[in-house]
UniProtKB/Swiss-Prot annotation:
PANTHER family: 4-HYDROXYBENZOATE SOLANESYLTRANSFERASE, PROTOHEME IX FARNESYLTRANSFERASE, MITOCHONDRIAL. It catalyses: heme b + (2E,6E)-farnesyl diphosphate + H2O = Fe(II)-heme o + diphosphate. It comes from the Bacteria. It is an enzyme of class 2 (transferase). One of its GO terms (cellular component) is plasma membrane. This is Protoheme IX farnesyltransferase.
Amino acid sequence: MSVVESHDIEFAAPRISEASVADYIALLKPRVMSLVIFTALVGLLLAPGYIHPVLAFTSILCIAVGAGASGALNMWYEDDIDAKMTRTANRPIPRGRVSKPEALTFGLVLSFFSVVTLGILVNWFAAALLAFTIFFYVVIYTIWLKRWTAQNIVIGGAAGALPPVVAWAAAAGSLSVEPMLLFAIIFFWTPPHFWALALFRAGDYANAGVPMLPVTAGPDATRLSILLYTIVLVAVAFAPWPLGYFDAIYGITSLALGGWMLLLTLRVYRLRHGSAALRASRSLFKFSILYLFALFAVLLLEVIVRGVIGALA
């Protein structure tokens, strides 16, 4: 019988996660989440009827958590892409601060929590829409479309357009024309917004093997597509006013914002080379964020004005 010395045995120490709270917050894509929360809030407040403030808060919280879960699962699947892109190389997974299994578990737990909580406390119709939104973003867009087609952001944009629809369903228990209009505005806003980004980040996307439109069709075709989608966006965003769904404050603001965005888009279309072209794309990308926030802020203002008028009547 032999004696085994203690130094002959190597014990593998369990891996201790180096992730901080900030790393897990980064997995949620907080900047994207802020836009989701705001558009969802507008959808919820525009919905007819009354929803208890606690249930309203719960609805927005669940939608926000669901959006964050989608972001975490997106980063889990795209760690190889993120590592190759300057814009995303410092994210928690490529930097080794969060492991892929940790990100996957985090995303799945948050997805389950957000859907089940919304279903139990608010209604299962809204919960089903939230589950579909998460599925569409993670499976249809992230896993399938993004690496396969240059139209990834066009089709995948539906996921980003659904939060106000989910919020409306949470408040009203059903859907009508208005949430579909909100969906259409965000849906047609998404391609010019992301293609403007892709124009000045084309090298990043090419290095990562992502078939964004500037990589597959070239910058000139992308500029034309941005122009065409912006024209459609301006028309779709304005339409609710003459159709009688939103009021004059919204309609006039929509025209002003749309006109400015169209001017910036024409500038992108005209400037084809050099630093001026890159600056034009950056300006359009930045303004497009302001455009959507401002448009939905005016809708929120209309809700407040209607409430004040109703209280005084």
